[in-house]
Amino acid sequence: MMHPVLTDWSILFFCQELKVVFPNSQRMNRGGQVISEIVESCRSHEITDLILVHEHRGQPDGLIVCHLPLGPTAYFGLLNVVTRHDIKDRKAMGKMSEAYPHLILDNFTTKTGERTANIMKHLFPVPKPESKRLITFANRDDYISFRHHIYEKHGGPKSIDLKEVGPRFELRLYQIKRGTVDQSEAQNEFVLRPYMNTAKKQNSLGV
């Protein structure tokens, strides 16, 4: 996982928390490296996925997920980011766990939605059955809500205490390319066209 030269604490905290969200990940500053050098370095070290975090004036505003070695690459706008450091009531939060999480992928029913869900799914190893960590990607009207929880069982199977861990954010998919992020000539698989003239709004990811 890489991010630009840091200009604000918000992007720093967010990237630190993403490192825990995605198991087995490493966080690096991009510095002056060009994208092609980063991708080639990842390939040579047999890294399976590259996540690039973009920022504007220190605030995270974009996420690129590139599957290696051949793609695809998904581009997302990043909205409504709330890090653990932004939450005042820390006592109400659960502790960050590094166990492999169970995934909930909700309402990715179209072809593009299934493709997006698969891109996200491959960022996470298979969890152990006893893992008490949950990560949710829930699609509503093409905005993907990310939530991170842990749970504890108390007594019967229906008695579950769910605690949000953070961070939380929304994703807006705007492009999927068949190749890797450094391949400008790669064919587009999906491009968001929000200003298309249609009588009825068609959701791209789900119902």
Task: Say what each PLM segment does.
Residues M1-V207:
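Phospho-regulatory, Ser/Thr- and acidic-rich intrinsically disordered linkers and terminal tails
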